[in-house]
């Protein structure tokens, strides 16, 4: 009874625009959707007194995007002037889509995809000027270890940017992928 009722109520709420729904409908790929939304991923930081512009964040810098998905956001950072961009995720299926987009955008020469766990990487100490984790921390099992590892591989004077949707947000827990009812979690 509970599931059927939820299913009926859910029909009253339109699903939010979501990349997986768009990809399933053949509208766009996850990577391209991420790329188009790239500016949205950094707007939180541009309002701070520490960052004056996207060029300030990325220009001439080595950037690691932890929890990059299909790397559309990563490519956006590359287009903002990053010297080298590295995307890291644990989902192997994203790698091909990421390299395809890098080629399409002319970023292949400065892009690397790393399949791995952000809590224990193979990067040398102080490898990156910028580490960004956009909508990633809510997916990691050991956030303290991920942050400690990020600190290890971040260059002295580098910047770590982290944001994630709070669980208690109306569409928290990423249930908006399949359920349009706010606060259902």
Predicted segment positions?
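Histidine-centered divalent metal-coordination motifs
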Residues: 139
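A short glycine-rich, Lys/Arg-flanked "PGG" loop and its adjoining helix->strand segment in the class I
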Residues: 144-156
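Short glycine-/acidic-enriched loop or helix-start segments at secondary-structure transitions
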Residues: 75, 97, 142-143, 171-173
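Glycine-rich, phosphate-binding/catalytic loops in enzymes
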Residues: 80, 148-150, 177-181
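Conserved class I S-adenosyl-L-methionine
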Residues: 161-185
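Conserved N-terminal segment of class I S-adenosyl-L-methionine
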Residues: 1-124, 130, 147
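A short beta-strand submotif of the Rossmann-like class I SAM-dependent methyltransferase core
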Residues: 133-136
């Amino acid at each position: 009874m509970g599931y059927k009722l939820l299913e009926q109520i859910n029909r009253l709420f339109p699903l939010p625009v979501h990349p997986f729904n768009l990809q399933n409908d053949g509208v766009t790929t996850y990577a391209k959707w991420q790329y188009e939304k790239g500016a949205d991923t950094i707007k939180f930081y541009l309002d701070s007194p520490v960052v004056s512009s996207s060029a300030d964040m990325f220009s001439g810098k080595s950037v690691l995007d932890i929890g990059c998905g299909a790397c559309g956001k990563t490519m956006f950072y590359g287009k903002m002037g990053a010297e080298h961009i590295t995307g890291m995720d644990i989902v192997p299926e994203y790698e091909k889509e990421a390299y395809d987009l890098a080629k399409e955008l002319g970023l292949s020469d400065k892009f690397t995809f790393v399949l791995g766990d952000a809590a224990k990487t193979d990067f040398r100490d102080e490898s990156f000027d910028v580490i960004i984790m956009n909508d990633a921390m809510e997916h990691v099992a050991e956030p303290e270890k991920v942050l400690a590892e990020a600190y290890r591989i971040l260059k002295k004077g580098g910047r770590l940017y982290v944001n994630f949707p709070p669980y208690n947000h109306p569409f928290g827990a990423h249930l908006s992928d399949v359920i349009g009812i706010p606060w259902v979690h």
